A protein has these predicted regions:
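A short Gly-Trp-Pro
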Residues: 1-8, 13-149
Length: 149
C-alpha cells in the first residue's frame, strides 16, 4: 500500500490523510452497522490515531451501543452527512475509517466478516473470507493484527 493514503466526505469539507498502514480491516454485519450504513454491513479499516491527520470542520459524533453492547462513536460531516469515522472503546488508540470515504476505495482489503449472525439472508458474504458469528475473541483479534502487518 502506498503511503500516505487519504479520504474525506462527499462535499470535501472534511479531509484526512493517514501515514500508516491499516492495523486491521473488516466488514461488520451487526444491526447497528446495517442501520448506520443503510446496507448489509459497514466496511471499516482501523489505523493508529497518531498517524491520522484530519482537516476541516470537526465531525459530528454520535455515540450508540452497538450489538455487542459496547459504546461506539460514529463521526460524520455536518454539511453532507457522509460517514467518516468510528471510535470504539475496545480499541482506544485506533481510529476507524469507513472504506467508502477513501479516495481510492480499492485499497480496502477486508480480512474478515464479523457479526455475520445478524447479516440478512440476502447479504453476499465472501466465501473465501473467515466469517465470525460475533466479534473476534482476543486470540482472533491478535491474529487480525498480526495478519495486517
Amino acid at each position: 500500500m502506498k503511503l500516505p493514503f487519504s479520504g474525506g466526505c462527499s462535499c470535501g469539507a472534511i479531509r484526512y490523510e493517514c501515514s500508516a498502514k491499516p492495523l486491521f480491516s473488516w466488514n461488520c454485519h451487526c444491526r447497528d452497522c446495517q442501520r448506520a450504513s443503510g446496507s448489509t454491513h459497514c466496511p471499516v479499516l482501523y489505523v493508529p490515531k497518531s498517524a491520522l491527520k484530519v482537516t476541516g470542520p470537526e465531525a459530528k459524533h454520535a455515540t450508540v451501543h452497538a450489538e455487542s453492547g459496547r459504546p461506539v462513536s460514529r463521526g460524520l460531516c455536518t454539511n453532507c452527512g457522509s460517514n467518516l469515522f468510528i471510535l470504539a472503546d475496545l480499541v482506544p488508540t485506533m481510529q476507524g475509517l469507513w472504506a467508502g470515504s477513501l479516495d481510492d476505495p480499492n485499497i480496502f482489503k477486508p480480512q474478515i466478516n464479523v457479526w455475520t449472525r445478524s447479516a440478512p439472508k440476502w447479504s453476499l458474504l465472501d466465501p473465501s473470507m473467515e466469517n465470525l458469528d460475533v466479534a473476534p475473541n482476543a486470540e482472533q483479534f491478535q491474529a487480525l493484527l498480526d495478519g495486517a502487518a
